[in-house]
C-alpha cells in the first residue's frame, strides 16, 4: 500500500499528466484514504467504503492516464473496461461479474511477478547449476588424465568453474544442450459458455488439463534458451502458489481499481429510443450490486467487491451523470470535470512529461544513429496545429499530437537507416513544410489529422 501523501501523489502524477489539477487532487485523496482505512481498528475499518469517482471530460484529456498512473503508484491491480461491452444477464455479451474475475486474474499475475522477483537470486543460482549439469558431460575437458584418484574430481570441479565463468561472460551462447522440456499433451479445448458461466468454463478447462498432464520430451536448444526454461521452472518451484492466491485475493479486494470507461454510454439520454434506454438501464442495474458490494465467485475463490475503487469516465456529450439511475449515482458521490486542452497545454505535454512524445521519437531514431533536435518554435507550431485541427474537426485532445508528430517525422523515419550519423534539427519551417499539403486543404485535415 502506498504511503505517499496527497501532495506527493499529485507531484508524481505531474511527471506524466499535464493540467487537470482538480482531478489529480481528488484521486490522490482517494488513494490516501485507502492507507488511512488500513490504520483503523477492524471494527470501523469494514464500515469505511471507498468514495467512487466519475470523471467527465472529452477524449484525450487524461482520464484514463490518471487512473492508470494512480494504480502504478500504489502497485494496485488495475482493470480498464468499456461499460458498453456489458449487457443484461441473458443477452449476448459479457456479464458484469466478469470484470471482477479479470481483476483477480490481474492481481494474481501481479503478485506472482513480485514473488518471482523475490526468489530471483535463488532461482538464478539453481538454474545455473542445472545448466552446468547439462554442459559438463558434453565438455571434452572432463576426459582428463586418471593417473591419480583425486584428478577426476578436481578436474571436474575446475572444469565446472571454468564453464561457470564462460557462461557468465556470455561465451557459451553459441553452444547447444539437450534437455527435457514440457510438451503440451492432449487436445487444446476452448469451452463455450453462456454469459455469467465463464467460471464453469474455466473449471472445465482445468479439469481437462489435469486429465491430460503435460509430457516431457528431450530437445536440443541454445544455452540461452535452455537457461530461460530452467529459470522459469526453478522460479515456479520456489514460489508458494497458495500464498500467491491468498495475497492476490486480499490485494484485489482491498486495493483493486476498476476504471469504467464510456460510462456515459449506458446512461439514458434524450436522443435514445425507448428500447435503448431499457437496455442501458438493465446494464446499470446489473452494475449496481458489484459497485455496492457483493461476493463474486472466481476460480480463485470468492471475491468481495465492497472495498474496490470504481472510477467511471465519459465525455457526457449527450447525457449527464444525473441520467444514471439514482441508486448508481449514489455509489459515485465524487464528480470531477476535466478541462479541454489548448495549445499551451499541448506545448507542455510535448516538453514536460518524462515520457513525452518528443523524447520517444528522439530515442527511436537514435537507435538508427540519427540525432534529432527540436527547436522551441517547432514545438509551438505543433501545439498550434493540434489546437487548430481539434477546433476544425473532432476534438480528440492530446491524441491529436500523435497524428501530427507521426506525419511530421514520417519521411525521416523511413529514411533513418540511410541517415545514420546525421544530426537533424526540427524547426518551425520543417514542421510547416511537412504539414503544408494537409493544412492547406480543409478536407485533407479532416481525414488525415
Curated annotation (Swiss-Prot):
Q: Which family does the UniProt entry place this protein in?
A: Belongs to the ClpX chaperone family. HslU subfamily.
Q: Which UniProt keywords apply?
A: ATP-binding, Chaperone, Cytoplasm, Nucleotide-binding, Stress response
* Function of the molecule: ATPase subunit of a proteasome-like degradation complex; this subunit has chaperone activity. The binding of ATP and its subsequent hydrolysis by HslU are essential for unfolding of protein substrates subsequently hydrolyzed by HslV. HslU recognizes the N-terminal part of its protein substrates and unfolds these before they are guided to HslV for hydrolysis.
Residues that, per the record, bind ATP: 18, 60-65, 261, 327, 399
Please state what the protein is called.
ATP-dependent protease ATPase subunit HslU
Q: Does the keyword Zinc apply?
A: no
A single Gene Ontology CC annotation of this entry is: HslUV protease complex
Biological process per Gene Ontology, one example term: protein unfolding
Q: Describe its assembly.
A: A double ring-shaped homohexamer of HslV is capped on each side by a ring-shaped HslU homohexamer. The assembly of the HslU/HslV complex is dependent on binding of ATP.
